[in-house]
Amino acid sequence: MHLSPQEKDKLLIVTAALLAERRLNRGLKLNHPEAVAWLSFLVLEGARDGKSVAELMQEGTTWLRQDQVMEGVPELVHEVQMEAVFPDGTKLVTLHDPIR
């Protein structure tokens, strides 16, 4: 299997996001890397599902609440930027203050 560096990065995000999802399902709070991976994964999947950049930017502020992350994490995550593949090409999606 030959993967580009970008594809390897996305695989790492997916792996970390699946771990984050399991921890959320067990009621555990996410740390900084887990929270960023989870948000990034949801952007990638939303783009794959056909959502627009605007939809993802709006929905992205509802995916994680402050009570789902460890203390201090919301203050560390001011924005999450992710390049995602849309039907009309690759676009940058930015989530501003996504943990509310």
From Swiss-Prot:
Cite the record's note on assembly: Heterotrimer of UreA (gamma), UreB (beta) and UreC (alpha) subunits. Three heterotrimers associate to form the active enzyme.
Q: What is this protein called?
A: Urease subunit gamma
Q: Which organism is it from?
A: Synechococcus sp. (strain CC9605)
Q: Which GO terms describe its biological process?
A: urea catabolic process
Q: Which GO terms describe its molecular function?
A: nickel cation binding; urease activity
As for family, the record states: Belongs to the urease gamma subunit family.
**Entry superkingdom:** Bacteria
Q: Which UniProt keywords apply?
A: Cytoplasm, Hydrolase
Q: What Enzyme Commission number does this protein have?
A: 3.5.1.5
**Gene responsible for this protein:** ureA
Give the matching NCBIfam families.
Answer: PRK13241.1 (NF009712), urease_gam (TIGR00193)
Q: Where in the cell is it found?
A: Cytoplasm
List the GO cellular component terms: cytoplasm
* Metabolic or biological pathway: Nitrogen metabolism; urea degradation; CO(2) and NH(3) from urea (urease route): step 1/1
Q: Which HAMAP family does UniProt cross-reference here?
A: Urease_gamma
* Catalyses which reaction(s): urea + 2 H2O + H(+) = hydrogencarbonate + 2 NH4(+)
